[in-house]
Amino acid sequence: MSVLFTILLMAVIGGFIGAMTNYIAIRMLFRPYKAIYLFNKRLPFTPGLIPKRRDELAEHIGKVVVSHLLTEDAIRARLLDENLQKEITDTITKMFHEKMQLETTPNELLHHFGYENAEIRSMAWIEKTMEKEINHFLSTKKTTKMSDLIPTMLESELTTKLPHVTERITSKMALFVASEEGKSQIKQMLQKFFEEHGKMGSMARMFINVDSFSEKIQQEGLKLIDQEDTKNLINQLLTTEWKNFEAKELQELIPTEKQVHLAGQLTSELIQTFPHEKLFNQPIQVILRNYETTIVEKVIPFAVERMLDFVATHSAEIVERMDLAKLVETQIATFSLPEIEKLVVEISGRELKMITYLGGILGGFIGVIQGILAMWI
């Protein structure tokens, strides 16, 4: 009985010593947090291993994360993963549908981002920029001929339209001459002609019936207008004037002293025609609703794909600029020692307990062996 008791006692003592040794060793990884001094001498193993090597640990963890976990290839592969693309697309699509249920005007949206009086400030900026650009254009192009300012397509289109303009002019002239107003104008011109020529005019009026002569002039005028030579002459005059216009420099049409006034006037006219009230106060959803299907089916998937492809292509540069190793090191360095201890215990608490139990088992086993050996010695 005494032999068995001795062996059990040695086993219990050995198990206790083994378990406590491992427990203390584990605790010494974290404790004490600071060095302990006795008679101005630092006690060994103070501070604990992790507090003592904290900076080195943070640096090495950062390097390990970048070298073996968040590598460029791993990041690129993840960014090009179709599942990730689908998840991001679905998330953005869901957010888009949620926003489409609201009624948000551009004014409200800009106000949300801290941009006050958006409509007034935007229109003031547009007006200022527009006037500046018009002034700049007029100043830099003042010696440029109009033929160089007018787009080739527009010039060609206007040139081909000249015969149509001629037809329209002769048509309007014929309509006017044939009208009662035209006849009245001819009669007034004849009467004025006679009055301006004194006695000769009075004598001519004795032999000429103004009404019948007016009708005759009216008929001859219509014949003259309808003649091909007349149309050719008008067309030639228009062509000549157009060529003269093209040959002029911009400053001949708009003198330098009038440029500022013209730019301001033109800007004001353009601003008045700009529907800014409707643009800034109409819900964005109303504008987008006509394109909702296209945005969901094409725009969002395309934008997500292009964005991920861009990030993947430049992942090496992005990772380098982000300096992930330094980022991880900095984040770990911000943790307090109790937080690091808690984090490690939460992650590997079970394993640490098993190490303690293993120390107890080994200590107990060694105690049994010691008890047996003690009986033999």
Curated annotation (Swiss-Prot):
Q: Tell me what organism the protein belongs to.
A: Listeria monocytogenes serotype 4a (strain HCC23)
Q: Which Pfam families match?
A: DUF445 (PF04286)
Where in the cell is the protein located?
Cell membrane
Q: Which residues cross the membrane?
A: 1-21, 357-377
Question: What family is reported?
Answer: Belongs to the UPF0754 family.
- Top-level taxon in the UniProt lineage: Bacteria
A GO CC term?
A: plasma membrane
The way it spans or sits in the membrane comes to: Multi-pass membrane protein
Q: What does UniProt list as this organism's lineage?
A: Bacteria, Bacillati, Bacillota, Bacilli, Bacillales
Q: Keywords of this protein's UniProt record, alphabetized?
A: Cell membrane, Membrane, Transmembrane, Transmembrane helix
What protein name is recorded for this chain?
UPF0754 membrane protein LMHCC_0318
